Amino acid sequence: MLLSQTRGRLPSTLRSFSRRALSTTLPRGKDSEETALNKVSRNVTQPISQGASQAMLYATGLTEEDMNKAQVGISSVWYNGNPCNMHLLDLSNRVREGVQKAGLVGFQFNTVGVSDAISMGTKGMRYSLQSRDLIADSIETVMGGQWYDANISIPGCDKNMPGVLMAMGRVNRPSLMVYGGTIKPGCARTQNNADIDIVSAFQAYGQFLTGEITENQRFDIIRNACPGGGACGGMYTANTMATAIEVMGMTLPGSSSNPAESKAKDLECLAAGEAIKRLLKEDIRPSDILTRQAFENAMIVVNITGGSTNAVLHLIAIADSVGIKLDIEDFQKVSDRTPFLADLKPSGKYVMADLHNIGGTPSLLKFLLKEGVIDGSGMTVTGETLAKNLEKVPDFPADQKIIRPLSNPIKKTGHIQILRGSLAPGGSVGKITGKEGTRFVGKARVFDDEDDFIAALERNEIKKEEKTVVVIRYTGPKGGPGMPEMLKPSSALMGAGLGSSCALITDGRFSGGSHGFLIGHIVPEAAVGGPIGLVKDGDTITIDAEKRLLDLDVDETELARRRKEWEALRDAGKLPQTGLTMRGTLGKYARTVKDASHGCITDSVE
């Protein structure tokens, strides 16, 4: 008899049940009944003592039969102010439809999001990385407070993906991710109908400043770069993380390359219901999938595809959520043995929609598995191993030009390089594809704010004939605060034709859309007294990717003098403001965030 059918009667069996303590954890055990799927939600749907909980659930439209079903929290990062996210409510509705058809109860809820592209180059960018941890916190909060048995998350923009994975790792209940999907390429009518994307819009600014394009061409680019819903199209951060998460096994096959507006994405959403039911039946949790080997596969694929440097701190943070220690040197070890094969933007020619047309991520992973580059033994959200998932996947067409063969790589080793030295004793992350060379020596031009750099560029103060290392500092996780991305400065440099004569280093981050000679994630950051805060205009800086060095050519005596000067300015309150003196959400973030080499996590107990 269902509890809801007692109508005031209290049989002895139920009196006994109502006094029995129900565990709030997820014990592993054998239970052949269908109700075994609701191991968590039955803490509120079954006990007589939780009648008020049940009354609230009936008010949502649940039936008496529904009270015995597993409940799935469907968390979407939907908001209509960003193309990466504006379609996610539609996808969430389709996911719920699939969940209900699978005989489960689907409850939809939302979490926060920040558009990197809209906030880029403004103070709004300070909220971007912080949103990753807010997403994780909010999903964890709802999953814990509402007693849902499983989670399906639907992210779209850059920080969404690691945020939902961190929540899945913390909660550790059966979970899977449905990626919102990639946008279609745009088309520039004034440039022979060339394919364009969001990075084209960023670079158009520098091209306009130098007279390479007219105002009419510039407007044509920004008006047509983004033709609809979906994440930015190249191997930028969103597609990088989605691809990494697919190879780790936390999505259904093809999720990372299925375009946002496609039948394939629609079918994927519907299939998520049966997939999550199998995970519940077999008690497969994120901790069973997100193993050390899964993270090895992810690091390999990030290097193979020329993916975003943001993957370094995001994968470290996701690993931390499941108790796996990943550090920046792990990325270097993988990079040293992994070739760069993908001719994908930002450094290459093609976008994710092009990869989808030749078989997508599944065909890429099959190619890598056949070549022995990745390990296929790990469990995935299908309930099968990665290798099993790839058995019937078609090979790439013989004439495809997007993914190079191992015998003819773009670069024999990976593009992600971990550099240390007198400027970055705690590490830094370089994005070195080889096109910009592997060594750069130049004179420092220092800016405490990216707006000051843009103003200098507009005044034509950065000369093409001079080797310059642009230093943008006080942009770290505590200093920014929020470790904003430097896509606007890096794109402006490239657009202005300064990519070969200028390098850019920062204690902030770079967008997945950035390319050029770029070093970010410098630890320690300027706000906490890192050496980058001691650099002055005219100092010689050496970047050597082969020796993995980031050095400041200033003797120890002079550095000691500068440090005393810096400390005096700090004590007098004359340094740039950091998050450490702020209130509100950014101040709270600055006081809890770890450095970039430790993933910028905010829930550390150390």
Curated annotation (Swiss-Prot):
Its EC number is 4.2.1.9. Binds 1 [2Fe-2S] cluster per subunit. Disruption phenotype: Requires supplementation with isoleucine and valine for growth. Results in considerably lower kidney tissue burden in murine infection models. It holds the Pfam family ILVD_EDD_N. It is found in: Mitochondrion. GO terms for molecular function: 2 iron, 2 sulfur cluster binding; dihydroxy-acid dehydratase activity; metal ion binding. Its main location: mitochondrion. The active site is at residue 511. DHAD activity is inhibited in dose-dependent manner by 2-hydroxy-3-methylbutyric acid with an IC(50) of about 8 mM. GO terms for biological process: branched-chain amino acid biosynthetic process; isoleucine biosynthetic process; L-valine biosynthetic process. Its cofactor is [2Fe-2S] cluster; Mg(2+). Pathway: Amino-acid biosynthesis; L-isoleucine biosynthesis; L-isoleucine from 2-oxobutanoate: step 3/4; Amino-acid biosynthesis; L-valine biosynthesis; L-valine from pyruvate: step 3/4. Gene3D superfamilies: IlvD/EDD C-terminal domain-like. InterPro entries: DHAD_IlvD/Edd (IPR050165), Dihydro-acid_dehy_C (IPR042096), DihydroxyA_deHydtase (IPR004404), DiOHA_6PGluconate_deHydtase_CS (IPR020558), ILV_EDD_C (IPR056740), ILV_EDD_N (IPR000581), IlvD/EDD_N (IPR037237). Mg(2+) binds at residues 116, 158, 485. [2Fe-2S] cluster binds at residues 84, 157, 232. HAMAP family: IlvD (MF_00012). This is Dihydroxy-acid dehydratase ilvC, mitochondrial. The lineage of its organism: Eukaryota, Fungi, Dikarya, Ascomycota, Pezizomycotina.
